[in-house]
């Protein structure tokens, strides 16, 4: 029987943060958080030699590039099988059960843990120059993005903005399904602004793309490719070398 050991990740990462953030050049963090994407649904084998740990249908060349140039943490378990508890756990570095946020909408102990430090707050505590941003799906009823320490945000969004315009009635245009491209452009613009201002940054880009209802560009319906990640890499020459990209799934 396999036992999964949960850890309070932010506590463990504090010494690491202190060491790298006190360096001459603070690194930039880009966390791409993917909703409803399964562990074996990209073309990257999560376990070498195991065909059942990757997809031979979905072609994700830029995720392959991330894996090739970085690390694949195949035993890095998501905090929960549900999106909202996972997002809250990632933000605070605590398990859903400890936060008492284990289902989609019920926040049982909100007042008891709002004082817990978050990733943006931890970065700012280590280096006050950090600028933090969150774009895309928030879906965390325990706390608003600004209260969590984000300087720039497009609001405490749920799943709706992934399908509808701001009026919540008009479907998104065909050229921007699930806001894939506009979210990516917004993220690239944010990064450019911080580079120009010589400010270190932390960006969390939480895509709606994999969540139902599924949508795509007309010309790519027959063949999926991770165009949004590719768009980010096409802009890499405009960004500093001190960048740590992280791709995570909130369910797998």
Question: Where on the chain are the PLM-derived regions?
Answer:
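Bacterial N-terminal signal peptides that target proteins for export
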Residues: 1-11
